[in-house]
From Swiss-Prot:
It comes from Avian rous-associated virus type 1. The gene is V-RMIL. ATP binds at residues 89-97, 109. Residues 1-14, 49-73 have a biased composition (Basic and acidic residues). One of its GO terms (cellular component) is plasma membrane. Its EC number is 2.7.11.1. The active site is at 202 (proton acceptor). This is Serine/threonine-protein kinase-transforming protein Rmil. Pfam families: PK_Tyr_Ser-Thr (PF07714).
Length: 450
């Protein structure tokens, strides 16, 4: 065995003239048989060198572990200069949204705070600590935040338009199945947020985005503590900008914290109203202060009579439940989601064409409601469903049949009455003529006698 080892060492050129092994390689030769375990003793490096290698490996492992984890809010902060801010998309009371670049397209919301106090900055980071844990198909993905040059939230970029834009600007022609599915996906996303103890506080059609495949993405949620701690002027602007979706208790602002799961439910009820009517509530009132006063006092509610006639009754009942004036009487999103899913299962199904794209990647692809198909929330229904024009036509035909039936039944009686009246008139006229003749004869007789 010893002779074999010496031959192997000689082949590698590591044996010195004096028979020492000072030039031995740190790795065993590839041809070394696996049974020669005694070679391991010859491969040992000096003690100090081995310790340095072990220390370096430990540091590398710690560094990789740090890079692989983002456990604190500070790990999600994007350094100044890494985000390229591009086109301005829109603005609100709380901030302005831009399209930006950061490892791809992102949405950057610059908050309306120029010099936050340490308390505000800490509140902002605390809220970010909640947002970074959200992962759902119907929620805009939180990607990070920045504090310089100003506070900003970075989320995924959604290729598509808001639900508000679809319903009230370009009037996208949705079928009823898609309107119901938009409601289902929105309820699904809100149910997830509430399960995470996140209150949206500003749910409205402007903050519900439809991706290219009509997947709902809810945005602009969270930051509740930040919104409540910043100046009252910002709160007032937010109130005036979103009053159509605000619950009565939020408008009154009598409670210390009027926002709750139920206030989000009320806002969802207004979104349902938009979906099922194609209109905004209180469109006949132009005075914003009047709306604030009447809704806050409980004198005004959305007019559910404007809901389309082809809207399922279960959806209309759910809408009325969500819009209850008393907070405790409204359902919560687990119940809402279950109701919408039950409604979807109870309606008729048809098979889709293989070439037709799926409605969304979260499921709900096979169900279609031909009886509830409509061209647009604002236009009459086209082929494929019973439209308003067909209802009016049917009513007209029924009314015509009733009139004809009345004429057939009543015409003989009417003719008889008319004929009898005419006969009486003739008889009366003849009687008057006879009496007139008698009077004439009676008048002539005295003259003859004279």
């Amino acid at each position: 065995m010893e002779a074999v080892i010496k031959d192997l060492i000689r082949d590698q050129g590591v044996r010195g003239e004096g028979g020492s092994t000072a030039g031995l390689s740190a790795t065993p030769p590839a041809s070394l048989p696996g049974s020669l375990t005694n070679v391991k003793a010859l491969q040992k490096s000096p003690g100090p060198q081995r310790e340095r290698k072990s220390s370096s490996s430990s540091e590398d492992r710690n560094r990789m572990k740090t890079l692989g984890r983002r456990d604190s809010s500070d790990d999600w902060e994007i350094p100044d200069g890494q985000i390229t801010v591009g086109q301005r998309i829109g603005s609100g009371s709380f901030g302005t949204v831009y399209k930006g670049k950061w490892h791809g397209d992102v949405a950057v919301k610059m908050l309306n705070v120029t010099a936050p106090t340490p308390q505000q900055l800490q509140a902002f980071k605390n809220e970010v600590g909640v947002l970074r844990k959200t992962r759902h198909v119907n929620i805009l993905l939180f990607m990070g935040y920045s504090t310089k040059p100003q506070l900003a939230i970075v989320t995924q970029w959604c290729e598509g338009s808001s639900l508000y834009h679809h319903l009230h600007i370009i009037e996208t022609k949705f079928e009823m199945i898609k309107l119901i599915d938009i409601a289902r996906q929105t309820a699904q996303g809100m149910d997830y947020l509430h399960a995470k103890s996140i209150i949206h506080r500003d749910l409205k059609s402007n903050n519900i985005f439809l991706h290219e495949d009509l997947t709902v993405k809810i945005g602009d949620f969270g930051l509740a503590t930040v919104k409540s701690r910043w100046s009252g002027s910002h709160q007032f602007e937010q109130l005036s900008g979103s009053i159509l979706w605000m619950a009565p208790e939020v408008i009154r602002m009598q409670d210390k914290n009027p926002y709750s799961f139920q206030s989000d439910v009320y806002a969802f009820g207004i979104v349902l109203y938009e979906l099922m009517t194609g209109q905004l509530p209180y469109s006949n009132i132009n005075n914003r202060d009047q709306i604030i006063f009447m809704v806050g006092r409980g004198y005004l509610s959305p007019d559910l009579s404007k809901v389309r006639s082809n809207c399922p009754k279960a959806m209309k009942r759910l809408m009325a439940e969500c819009l209850k004036k008393k907070r405790d009487e409204r359902p919560l999103f687990p119940q809402i989601l279950a109701s919408i899913e039950l409604l979807a299962r109870s309606l008729p199904k048809i098979h889709r064409s293989a070439s037709e794209p799926s409605l969304n990647r979260a499921g709900f692809q096979t169900e279609d409601f031909s009886l509830y198909a409509c061209a647009s929330p604002k236009t009459p229904i086209q082929a494929g469903g019973i439209g308003e024009w067909a209802v009016h036509l049917l009513k007209g035909l029924l009314l015509g049949l009733v009139v004809i039936l009345l004429l057939v039944v009543c015409l003989p009686c009417l003719l008889q009455c008319v004929s009898s009246s005419i006969r009486k008139m003739i008889d009366n006229s003849l009687g008057y003529r006879e009496e007139y003749k008698k009077l004439q004869e009676a008048y002539k007789q005295p003259e003859r006698r004279a």
